[in-house]
């Protein structure tokens, strides 16, 4: 990747610290950076640093990570109130304004993964340990490439790690063919699938995640046979199982349904360079500030910042009425466990409405910041109520992803019986009756009901060719109940602009069309 990303990786060797396991802190300065890829200890630290870098890419807790958050908000299911609304199909969706880390950080991940993979064969260590390190690095590299190509379409492909010897070599920068990119992704994942195990510690890459990513790659390539086979293998593998609907986003998300969950720990954390990481604010982003509601005649707020109502919140983006319309309000259990209730009860002992239903019917305020339908998937009952930052692990992929992808893959292959079996596994858990027919709309709707605001629907809609249509129909902006409006997404916006600084640095690499 040479000099065009040299400035992206300068400093990684001196700031990335992580852990021998996710909850055991290891300071990077215990080993000299010059020997990072020359010993078993150095390779382990390099892998832990790679995990930390990857976690930082997928988590959201500051403006530097707003790109990851963007994908939660820019779909047909969202109503955006503030903060990053100008970047969504509006004035700031341009090459010098969009979050550059969505391009920069995956290439950092790729470069460091390649360094680990290349160095491992020359290091004296147990074969089993070497193999484990390489397998995990190859999955992370494939994951990074999969996110890059699904975001930008036109990307660079380079597996040679940057070193002081090659950093300033002359390179011709040109987009790789999508066929070559997917072939590279698949080689990494196919190798990993042959050797990984399903049972791994929380936050560590296992066979379930590798197969899920391989299935996604196959779906992008319209290879539905491979996608279906990978989904089948996860579902029948015996390790990953659907859990009760109340457990999915409960206090412990490291359960059998989780294929991969990013781990955080406040005791060993406080910075993205430490084992416990620097937390995230996903819960605060999707939840209204109920504690700002006022009731005429009551001198105090009826609701105070408290764990059951999510505590401190930002109230930036919410589920919209289109998403609500997809649920059976009388039967679907997900309304109870994925969202805060519409009807609120006072929890302030000083209020006249303590432990009583707030007067009138929802909405309790015309200000969406104070009250609107809110997501509960990322609620953290253990964090201080007056703090938005959470150290609760959050799920990157879960078995429900696999069931819905498998349903689509089998449906596209013409295997309606298996497609319905997989779709109905999700429906039955939610308390719904079995579906007897299946089509693309049924898959889209179940995906929305089950996987809303888990960060992947934008890519799903893009892949099936429905993104622009769905966003233009249903995506909403607004700050009050009377100011809610739609948006206009243009066809070229299905791919992000490449950061202008990168275009300038590479010189010969073309910008994506119409940016």
Which residues fall in each region the model found?
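Flexible, polar/acidic helix-loop-strand segments at domain edges
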Residues: 321-398
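Conserved, well-structured interaction surfaces
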Residues: 40-58, 80-152, 175-180, 189-202, ...
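Long, intrinsically disordered, low-complexity segments
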Residues: 40, 51, 106-107, 166, ...
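An aromatic- and glycine-enriched ligand-binding surface/loop that stacks and positions planar moieties
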Residues: 20-78, 190-193, 208-355
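C-terminal motif of bacterial Sec signal peptides marking the signal peptidase cleavage site
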Residues: 16-18
């Amino acid at each position: 990747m040479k000099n065009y990303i040299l400035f992206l990786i300068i400093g990684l060797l001196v700031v990335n610290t992580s852990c021998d396991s996710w909850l055991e802190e290891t300071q990077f300065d215990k080993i000299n950076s010059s020997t990072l890829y020359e010993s078993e200890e150095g390779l382990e630290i390099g892998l832990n640093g790679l995990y930390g870098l990857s976690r930082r890419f997928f988590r959201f807790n500051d403006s530097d990570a707003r790109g990851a958050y963007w994908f939660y908000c820019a779909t047909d299911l969202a109503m955006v109130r503030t903060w990053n609304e100008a970047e969504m199909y509006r004035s700031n969706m341009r090459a010098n304004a969009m979050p550059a880390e969505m391009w920069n950080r995956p290439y950092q991940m790729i470069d460091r993964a390649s360094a680990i993979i290349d160095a491992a064969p020359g290091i004296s260590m147990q074969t089993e340990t070497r193999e484990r390190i390489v397998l995990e690095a190859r999955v992370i590299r494939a994951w990074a490439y999969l996110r890059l190509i699904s975001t930008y379409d036109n990307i660079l492909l380079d597996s040679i790690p940057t070193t002081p010897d090659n950093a300033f070599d002359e390179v011709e920068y040109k987009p790789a063919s999508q066929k070559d990119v997917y072939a590279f992704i698949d080689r990494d994942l196919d190798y990993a699938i042959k050797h990984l195990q399903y049972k791994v510690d929380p936050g560590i890459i296992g066979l379930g995640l590798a197969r899920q990513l391989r299935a996604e790659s196959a779906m992008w390539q319209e290879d539905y046979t491979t996608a279906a086979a990978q989904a089948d293998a996860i579902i029948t593998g015996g390790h990953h199982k659907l859990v009760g609907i109340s457990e999915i986003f409960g206090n412990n998300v490291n359960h059998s349904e989780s294929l991969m969950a990013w781990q955080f720990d406040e005791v060993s954390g406080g910075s993205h360079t430490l084992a416990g990481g620097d937390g995230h604010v996903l819960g605060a982003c999707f939840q209204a500030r109920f504690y700002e509601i006022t009731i005429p005649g009551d001198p105090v707020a009826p609701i105070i910042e408290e764990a059951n109502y999510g505590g401190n919140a930002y109230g930036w983006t919410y589920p919209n009425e289109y998403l609500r319309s997809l649920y059976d309000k009388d039967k679907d259990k997900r309304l109870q466990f994925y969202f805060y209730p519409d009807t609120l009860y006072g929890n302030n002992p000083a209020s006249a409405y303590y432990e009583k239903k707030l007067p009138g019917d929802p909405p309790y305020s015309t200000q969406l910041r104070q009250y609107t339908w809110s997501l509960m998937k990322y609620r953290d009952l253990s964090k201080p109520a007056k703090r938005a930052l959470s150290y609760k692990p959050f799920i990157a992929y879960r078995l429900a992803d696999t069931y819905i992808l498998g349903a689509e893959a089998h449906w596209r292959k013409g295997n309606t019986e298996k497609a319905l079996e997989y779709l109905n596994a999700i429906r039955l858990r939610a308390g719904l009756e079995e579906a007897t027919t299946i089509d693309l709309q049924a898959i889209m709707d179940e995906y929305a009901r089950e996987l809303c605001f888990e960060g992947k629907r934008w890519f799903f809609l893009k892949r099936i060719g429905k993104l622009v249509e769905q966003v233009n129909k249903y995506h909403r902006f607004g700050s009050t109940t009377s100011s809610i409006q739609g948006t206009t997404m243009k066809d070229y916006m299905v791919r992000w602009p490449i950061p202008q600084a990168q275009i300038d640095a590479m010189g010969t690499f073309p910008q994506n069309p119409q940016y």
